[in-house]
Amino acid sequence: MPTLSGAIWSSIGGWTAEMPSRAADGNTSSGLAMTAFVADVQAALASLEPAAAKNTEVQRTVRQRVGQQAFRQAMLDYWQGSCAVTGLALPQALKASHAKAWALCTEDAERLDVFNGFLLSANLDALFDCYLASFADDGALLIAPTVPPAAREQLGLTGDLRLRWVAAQHRLYLAFHRAQCAWLNE
């Protein structure tokens, strides 16, 4: 069974082997050559579709965040094993959320800084992670106006919700997070 990389390599190999004959035909412009290459790759990919449709799993190379588990444990310790807002003490339903996203941190110290995170229930984490929720410097929960009242109620986000405490060191990261929330900056 051909693999994706093998099929592409075969296509490239066949295409590059034909380059002298294509040059002899006068087909040397980069646009025509690229068009031919793209057609060859598309044909190779099309030949893989039946095999790919029969498989329900793929093997991938993954770039994993080293330190994510340590960060989660630090969040569990700092927030005493419960949600920073609701107090929910069910670790399986809690997420270690970064105020300044892992990918946006410029150094490892920021990624692992306990003040760059909040232990949040899964529903709060989902909103916080996609910038539909944030927190004011005093810890008050801020929710985007695009989250309808009915959804807020269904998510249990009613009343005066706030972080159980806010350290001065949290405020820099909270300001960064709020700056990413387009609805707060309109």
Task: Give the ranges of each region predicted by the language model.
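A detector for short metal-coordination/catalytic motifs
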Residues: A70, L88-P91, A101-E186
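Short, mixed-charge, low-aromatic patches
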Residues: G26-A33, A74-Q80, D129-S134
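Short, charged surface segments at domain edges that flank catalytic/cofactor-binding sites
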Residues: A44-V85, W102-V114
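Residue-level detector of alpha-helix boundaries and kinks
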Residues: S29, A33, Q59-R60, T106, ...
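Mixed-charge, low-complexity interaction segments
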Residues: M1-Q42, A52, D138-L142, T146, ...
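Charged, low-complexity, helix-prone segments enriched in Lys/Glu/Asp/Gln
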Residues: G26, A33, F37, Q64, ...
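The −1 position to Zn-ligating cysteines in a subset of zinc-ribbon hairpins
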Residues: S82, K95, L120
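Conserved active-site aspartate in kinases
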Residues: H98
